């Protein structure tokens, strides 16, 4: 009888465990199905439910971690993606799954790349590559090479965006990163060609062409994009075909073959309309407008820019609308229609002010100044002078769009300026601002505001008081003046480090302080007594060593809490059997821990700490109707050369070495430009 009861209990336990396992696996499979169908948000819910149920199967749990990380990546929740890929890496490493470790390292690298942590991403992707080569996994090796190319490509682009540099003109570190991307893409291309993977070849050709384009290797870019176009046509991939046409147009622009570029842009426009992608259609119109501007066919340029403007208004893209107004102003100026040019320059100024685009605002002011100089009008630096009796084509009518998301006219100028002109415009037109110089007396105020603390004076002693519950704290005037002799640079940085340590104590853990005279053992935001300081004693405290010991202990415990262990891996149900297996793997593994693996862990922990301590960088936003690969530099050079050809070489009077002012210079050039623009208008 007793044996039967024991047998029944074992059977019941087996069935319960089987049902739980089936439930976890079924939830995970449903989550995978939903993600594959494109509903990643619903898929995440099922994966999270599977984690809540838990499983003893370590490989199943690793697969769930990987899928969850990928789903969160697709949903742009990169912090969650990083967390689950990190769990996946830890678990794969623990159970000795090298293939899983390679894939997890690659996924971590892709996530870190998107977060802008390129050096950490390179370490992870290199780990992926090393393991794949060790296992002779050609497919994994190809993916790792492609990922490394992507990371170096993104790194180069991120460094190469400080200003309106010409394509191919980069600092040495940017060029090195882009060249490394080319090398990895070419290795990837050779490998996927040997494997016969045509789809992967298409991706490699596309990225290789884009990287050559950035490096200024436009012939190589054309060759790569032509191959990308052929493969896209093989697969019937209209979106990839459209991108290839657009990239070919961009490359031919910089090769000076504008007619060829216009043909590719027209094919891009046709495919965009077939795909019913209004934003891409607007981008194509914008590119065609600029191309016909370079061809000096201003009537066609205006036609395409008006189409771009109409779609930008339809899509509420203020960035694109401002860019269209800038282009239309240039085209109308070239035709000698200064009234229309004035109107669009004013619209450009209005939009630049609205979106807070200072460079675009300066450009619009310069355009208005030149136009008004030609028309003999006076120019006000404070208000835009709206031109009168200006009739606008009916196709421009539309609802005023909402505020755009990003600055569109970064560091842009319409024409080349003399140093004198730039200097005068900077001083006369731009708003005057006082330089922001941190005075010694302001350093404590800065730290004080940063920490949410304030100073209170009790006789001669200044003690940091807790002000965490108040919204704004201002220091009385009598307490703001602190001489530079009282607190020097070393004192300031010492005080800053103490404030930071106090902030860490408040937010992160409860310190078990040694030799502490306070009775309370709970976390307190009030600083210890060693933080007390008088104005007559040095800032450095005799208890610095004790404080640093406490700080090191706090940090080490916090890092230990964050590191993944088997007890805090979500979804892992440990039984006696699995616990013994894990213990055996941890204690009896004779293989020394790989330094690269720990390097990855440390870098990932650093990324997590950085994410927790500071706000993430602002998301890169862009106008949907403006192409990513814009060729403003070529347009500006063309405009500048045209202006230079029209201008006269002024003979400087020996007796007037510096009397010839900016006003005289602008007036002479404006009159000449007015005459020449009239001739061009007559020719057209």
Swiss-Prot record:
Biological process (GO), any one: positive regulation of protein localization to cell cortex
Chief location of this protein within or outside the cell: cytoplasm
Result, substituting residue 243 to A: Abolishes location at mitotic spindle poles
Keyword GTP-binding part of the UniProt annotation: no
GO cellular component: cell cortex; cell cortex region; centrosome; cytoplasm; cytosol; lateral cell cortex; lateral plasma membrane; mitotic spindle pole
Disulfides per UniProt: none
Chain positions covered by the region annotation Important for interaction with NUMA1: 22-357
Role of this protein: Plays an important role in mitotic spindle pole organization via its interaction with NUMA1. Required for cortical dynein-dynactin complex recruitment during metaphase. Plays a role in metaphase spindle orientation. Also plays an important role in asymmetric cell divisions. Has guanine nucleotide dissociation inhibitor (GDI) activity towards G(i) alpha proteins, such as GNAI1 and GNAI3, and thereby regulates their activity.
Family that this chain belongs to: Belongs to the GPSM family.
Miscellaneous notes: Dysfunction of LGN is associated with the phenotype of multiple micronuclei due to chromosomal mis-segregation and defect in cell division through mis-localization of mitotic spindle regulator protein NUMA1.
Record's subunit section: Interacts with the dynein-dynactin complex; this interaction is inhibited in a PLK1-dependent manner. Part of a spindle orientation complex at least composed of GNAI1, GPSM2 and NUMA1. Interacts with LLGL2. Interacts (via TPR repeat region) with INSC/inscuteable. Interacts (via TPR repeat region) with NUMA1 (via C-terminus); this interaction is direct, inhibited in a PLK1-dependent manner, prevents the binding of NUMA1 with SPAG5 and promotes spindle pole organization. INSC and NUMA1 compete for the same binding site, but INSC has higher affinity and can displace NUMA1 (in vitro).
UniProt-recorded name of the protein: G-protein-signaling modulator 2
Biological classification of the source: Eukaryota, Metazoa, Chordata, Craniata, Vertebrata
Encoding gene per record: GPSM2
């Amino acid at each position: 009888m007793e044996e039967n009861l024991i047998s029944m209990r074992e059977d019941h336990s087996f069935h319960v465990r089987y049902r739980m396992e089936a439930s976890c696996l079924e939830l995970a499979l449903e989550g995978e199905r939903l993600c594959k169908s494109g509903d990643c948000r619903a898929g995440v819910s099922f994966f999270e439910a599977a984690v809540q149920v838990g499983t003893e199967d370590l490989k199943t749990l690793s697969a769930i971690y990987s899928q969850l990380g990928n789903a969160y990546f697709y949903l742009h929740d990169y912090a969650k993606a990083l967390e689950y890929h990190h769990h996946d890496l830890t678990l794969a490493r623990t159970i000795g799954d090298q293939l899983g470790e390679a894939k997890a390292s690659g996924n971590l690298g892709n996530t870190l790349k998107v977060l802008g942590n390129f050096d950490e991403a390179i370490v992870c992707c290199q780990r992926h590559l090393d393991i794949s080569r060790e296992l002779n996994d050609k497919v994994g090796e190809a993916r790792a090479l492609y990922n490394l190319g992507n990371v170096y490509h993104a790194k180069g682009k991120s460094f190469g965006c400080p200003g309106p540099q010409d394509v191919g003109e980069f600092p040495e570190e940017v060029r090195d990163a882009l060249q490394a991307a080319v090398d990895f893409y070419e290795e990837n291309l050779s490998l996927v060609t040997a494997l016969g993977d045509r789809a992967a070849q298409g991706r490699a050709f596309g990225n290789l062409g884009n990287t050559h384009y950035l490096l200024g290797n436009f012939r190589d870019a054309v060759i790569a994009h032509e191959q990308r176009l052929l493969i896209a046509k093989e697969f019937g991939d209209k979106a990839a075909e459209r991108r290839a046409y657009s990239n070919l147009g961009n490359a031919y622009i910089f090769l000076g073959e504008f007619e060829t570029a216009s043909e590719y842009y027209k094919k891009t426009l046709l495919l965009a309309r077939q795909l019913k992608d209004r934003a891409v259609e607007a981008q194509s119109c914008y590119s065609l407008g600029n191309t016909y501007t370079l061809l000096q066919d201003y009537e066609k340029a205006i036609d395409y820019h008006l189409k771009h403007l109409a779609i930008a208004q339809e899509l509420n893209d203020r960035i694109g609308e401002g860019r269209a107004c800038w282009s239309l102003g240039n085209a109308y100026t070239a035709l000698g229609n200064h009234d229309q040019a004035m109107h669009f320059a004013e619209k450009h100024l209005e939009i630049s002010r609205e979106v807070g685009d200072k460079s675009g605002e300066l450009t619009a002011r310069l355009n208005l100044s030149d136009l008004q100089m030609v028309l003999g009008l006076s120019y006000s630096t404070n208000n835009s002078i709206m031109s009168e009796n200006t009739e606008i084509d009916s196709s421009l009518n539309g609802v005023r769009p909402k505020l755009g998301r990003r600055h569109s006219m970064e560091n842009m100028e319409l024409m080349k300026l003399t140093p004198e002109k730039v200097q005068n415009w900077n001083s006369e037109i731009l708003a005057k601002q006082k330089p922001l110089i941190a005075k010694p007396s302001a350093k404590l105020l800065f730290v004080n505001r940063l920490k949410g603390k304030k100073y209170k004076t009790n006789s001669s002693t200044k003690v940091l008081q807790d002000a965490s519950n108040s919204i704004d704290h201002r220091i009385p005037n009598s307490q703001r003046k602190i001489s530079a002799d009282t607190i020097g640079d070393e004192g300031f940085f010492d005080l800053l480090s103490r404030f930071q340590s106090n902030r860490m104590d408040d937010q992160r853990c409860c310190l078990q302080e040694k030799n502490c005279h306070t009775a309370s053992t709970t976390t307190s935001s009030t600083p210890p007594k060693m933080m007390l300081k008088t104005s007559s004693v040095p800032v450095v405290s005799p208890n610095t060593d004790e404080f640093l010991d406490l700080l090191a202990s706090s940090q080490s415990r916090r890092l230990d809490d964050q590191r993944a262990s088997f007890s805090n891996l979500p979804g892992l149900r440990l039984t006696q059997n699995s616990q013994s297996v894990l213990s055996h793997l941890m204690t009896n593994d004779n293989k020394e821990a790989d330094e690269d693996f720990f390097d990855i862990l440390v870098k990932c922990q650093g990324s997590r700490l950085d994410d927790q301590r500071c706000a993430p960088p602002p998301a890169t936003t862009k106008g949907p109707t403006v192409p990513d690969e814009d060729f403003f530099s070529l347009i500006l050079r063309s405009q500048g050369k045209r202006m230079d050809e029209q201008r006269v070489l002024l003979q400087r009077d020996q007796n007037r070495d510096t009397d010839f002012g900016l006003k005289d210079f602008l007036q002479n050039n404006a009159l000449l430009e007015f005459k020449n623009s009239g001739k061009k208008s007559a020719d057209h």
